[in-house]
């Protein structure tokens, strides 16, 4: 009898604690509210406009360099004959080299800008687009740096052997044209990739993989030998996924706590 009384008291305590729990007494949040707060929102990459602006500036610079070099300095590179002495007291080649340095600085700033936004989108779980453009976004700056190295060698040769001045001008203009072609190809490929990504508006990679694994017939077998590069990519992908899940869980916990607090605050206090 005593044991039965204790069991009844225990059940009464549990029932009373459940009834007094405000979280259990709170109403469930509607489904659309949960989706609005917990579904990751897509943020497009805003780098396409800046990339297009830079390659347009690059194109204008090369065209002006060709016009200035051919019209002002091509007949005799040792004598600048620009109308109105626009480049005075600097020579035409000096103005072209200074413009090239400014263009390299713009490419450096672009690379930093792209890296900043790509790091942000990597933190949101889009590791595939980050890895697919990791080397592409740096290639334009590498091309500009390589061109600067070649121009420096040309200027050194011109300083030691100043006689074939017209040849040096031809080499400088040829390097500028080659840089323009290579940079435009890289930036065009990058622009196409980012535009497709922004247009598709995909969910984070881990959610996209869940959709794929929901249909086993679409999964190809990967048994057999794996190369070292493949293993490195798998390890890097797993690390990125773990980091994303940690940040996502922390964000969901904060949002859930905020929603619960706001829902409890809207309810009238129990008497």
Curated annotation (Swiss-Prot):
Keywords: Endosome, Lysosome, Membrane, Phosphoprotein, Transmembrane, Transmembrane helix. Coiled coil: none annotated. The chain crosses the membrane at residues 47-67, 94-114, 139-159, 172-192. Not N-glycosylated. Residues 68-93, 160-171 are lumenal. It comes from the Eukaryota. This is Transmembrane protein 192. PANTHER family: TRANSMEMBRANE PROTEIN 192. One of its GO terms (cellular component) is lysosome. InterPro entries: TMEM192 (IPR029399). The gene is TMEM192. Residues 1-46, 115-138, 193-271 are cytoplasmic. It is a multi-pass membrane protein. Belongs to the TMEM192 family. The modification Phosphothreonine is found at residue 15. It comes from Homo sapiens (Human). Homodimer. The modification Phosphoserine is found at residues 17, 229-230, 269. It is found in: Lysosome membrane; Late endosome. The keyword Phosphoprotein applies.
């Amino acid at each position: 009898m005593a044991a039965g009384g204790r069991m009844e008291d225990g059940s009464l305590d549990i029932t009373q604690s459940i009834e007094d729990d405000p979280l259990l007494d709170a109403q469930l949040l509607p489904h659309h509210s949960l989706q609005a707060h917990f579904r990751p929102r897509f943020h497009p990459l805003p780098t396409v406009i800046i990339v297009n602006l830079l390659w347009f500036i690059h194109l204008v610079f090369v065209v002006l360099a060709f016009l200035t070099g051919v019209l002002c300095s091509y007949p005799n590179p040792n004598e600048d004959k620009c109308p109105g002495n626009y480049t005075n007291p600097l020579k035409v080649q000096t103005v072209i080299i200074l413009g090239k340095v400014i263009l390299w600085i713009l490419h450096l700033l672009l690379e930093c800008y792209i890296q900043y936004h790509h790091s942000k989108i990597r933190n949101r779980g889009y590791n595939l687009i980050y890895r697919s453009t990791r080397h592409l976004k740096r290639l334009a700056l590498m091309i500009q740096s390589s061109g600067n190295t070649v121009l420096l060698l040309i200027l050194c040769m011109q300083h030691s052997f100043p006689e074939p001045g017209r040849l040096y001008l031809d080499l400088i203009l040829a390097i500028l044209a080659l840089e323009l072609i290579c940079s435009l190809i890289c930036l065009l490929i990058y622009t196409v990739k980012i535009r497709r990504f922004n247009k598709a508006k995909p969910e984070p990679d881990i959610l996209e993989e869940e959709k794929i694994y929901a249909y086993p017939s679409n999964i190809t077998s990967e048994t057999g030998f794996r190369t070292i590069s493949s293993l490195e990519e798998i390890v890097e992908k797993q690390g990125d996924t773990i980091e994303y899940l940690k940040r996502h869980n922390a964000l969901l916990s904060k949002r859930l706590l905020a929603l619960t607090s706001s829902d409890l605050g809207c309810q009238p206090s129990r008497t």
